[in-house]
């Protein structure tokens, strides 16, 4: 039998995660700008308790504009590949999976091995034992899941070079995933 895989929902979910990363970058940028403005304009000092020693918070590094194209392009391709597979699967099901046993076995092998395409042998920053680039436990959250963990944690930790590097790696794993999906 043909394994019952569908990829459209997964593609839409990953697209939502990517949109969250874009929003997180913008929110972080605005938060840093506001934080620095409050320091520079003396608002923190004005609100400080005069009975306690006041220590001015440190200014934060401005959030750079990171090239989001690798992630966005790979997600767009994932959406297209997922839809194409789901459409072909429905058409094949309507015809009763009229395929040779050998073709069914090849298709099934492609499908059950596809999840491995979302991993990289070097793993994630600071924890190489976690290799999945869509879902992984957070570095600081224990077993709480992080979506697109390399990119998300780079943003959360203000590590912009790492964020950009992880965005490229995410695009690479999504490309490999789509390449395998397109073979099916």
Regions found by a protein language model. Give the residues of each.
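Secretory-pathway/membrane protein signature
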Residues: 1-184
């Amino acid at each position: 039998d043909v394994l019952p895989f569908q990829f459209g929902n997964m593609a839409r979910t990953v697209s939502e995660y990517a949109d969250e990363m874009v929003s997180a970058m913008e929110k972080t940028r605005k938060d840093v700008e506001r934080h620095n403005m409050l320091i520079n304009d003396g608002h923190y000092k004005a609100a400080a308790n005069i009975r306690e020693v006041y220590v001015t918070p440190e200014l934060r590094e401005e959030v750079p504009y990171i090239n989001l194209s690798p992630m966005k392009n790979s997600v767009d391709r994932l959406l297209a590949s997922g839809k194409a597979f789901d459409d072909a699967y429905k058409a094949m099901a309507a015809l009763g999976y009229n395929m040779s046993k050998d073709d069914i076995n090849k298709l099934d092998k492609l499908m059950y091995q596809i999840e491995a395409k979302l991993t990289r042998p070097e793993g994630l920053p600071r924890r190489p034992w976690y290799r999945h680039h869509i879902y992984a436990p957070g570095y600081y959250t224990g077993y709480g899941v992080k979506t697109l963990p390399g990119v998300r944690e780079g943003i959360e930790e203000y590590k912009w070079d790492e964020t950009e590097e992880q965005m490229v790696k995410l695009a690479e794993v999504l490309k490999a995933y789509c390449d395998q999906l397109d073979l099916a």
